[in-house]
Design a protein with these regions (language model features):
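Nucleotide/phosphate-binding catalytic cleft detector across ATP-hydrolyzing
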Residues: 1-34, 38-143, 157-271
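A structural feature that tracks compact, well-ordered secondary-structure segments
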Residues: 149-151
Length: 271
């Protein structure tokens, strides 16, 4: 399976609540996001075996703010996937925004440990995305709910990472203000593809700001100018996002299928 086939396969498995008939040993990854929590299982080669997700707000700007809530959700996802696969999962990997240090960096590991998964490693989110996309040379931009992280790879080696506190939550805040609706309604509106064309003029400045933030993070690194750019994360689902982000960024960007699932898949590959 190539990278995109794996992403399509993972989406199918989550949607149908089924498991692929692939032998173990298995790897587990847990992505604790600002807007969602995703648990993914792959085989040793990184092929998706099963997965589950929940929309939840247990992390803010890359930091766990609802430890108990996060742990309960991971427990539920773990139980769901175990029931689908008919096995017990005992260890897993998780991820953090680049530059997260100290207790904040340890929190994600504590969450999955509390849910019954022994933490085996913790990886930067955009690095996980690069792993899922099988990128050895390029720039990966991971736009989460509260943070935007980037990873630059050269000949398979990580040569640069950075992170800024901007993301999909800011899109929802702008929608809430523009339409005078609660934040929760704005989140639902943002996820409705039928409304994307209508809301694009409202949220375009936020997308342009995200592109500018990434551009500024890469300022001074002229050697990266010809590197392909991949954008992942839930915000990249927005219809027109790829075009508008690319315009503001000044370069063509690539949005893979089901961009919300790219980082969780990559985390599992590190498990």
């Amino acid at each position: 399976m190539d990278a995109y086939e794996k992403i399509y396969q993972l989406y199918h498995l989550i949607k149908t609540k089924t498991a692929a008939d692939l032998p173990g040993p298995y790897k587990v990854g847990v992505d604790l996001g600002t807007a969602d929590v995703v648990l993914v299982v792959t085989d040793e080669s990184g092929n998706p075996v099963a997965g589950s997700m929940r929309w939840a707000s247990v992390v803010k700007d890359g930091l766990v703010v609802d430890f108990r809530g996060a742990m309960v959700i991971v427990e539920k996802l773990k139980a769901e996937v175990e029931a689908i696969m008919g096995i017990t999962l005992d260890k897993g990997a998780t991820a953090i925004p680049p530059g997260t240090v100290g207790r904040n960096a340890l929190a994600c590991g504590h969450v999955i440990a509390g849910a019954g998964l022994e933490p085996v490693c913790q990886v930067d989110e955009p690095v996980a995305a690069a792993k899922a996309l099988d990128i050895s040379h390029g720039i990966v931009v991971d736009i989460g709910g509260g943070t935007t992280g980037i990873a630059v790879l050269k000949n398979g080696e990580l040569v640069f990472t950075a992170d800024e506190p901007t993301g999909g939550t800011h899109v929802s805040l702008v929608l809430a203000g523009a339409y005078k609706i609660p934040f929760e309604e704005a989140e639902i509106l943002k996820r409705d593809p039928a409304r994307h064309r209508k809301i694009m003029p409202v949220i375009l400045p936020v997308i342009e700001k995200m592109a500018t933030v990434v551009k500024n993070m890469l300022a001074g690194y002229d050697e990266f100018n010809e590197y392909p750019v991949y954008v992942v994360g839930g915000t990249a689902y927005l219809q027109g996002f790829e075009t508008e982000f690319g315009k503001a960024f000044g370069r063509k960007v690539h949005v893979p299928p089901h961009p919300l699932l790219v980082t969780p898949l990559g985390i599992a590959m590190f498990g």
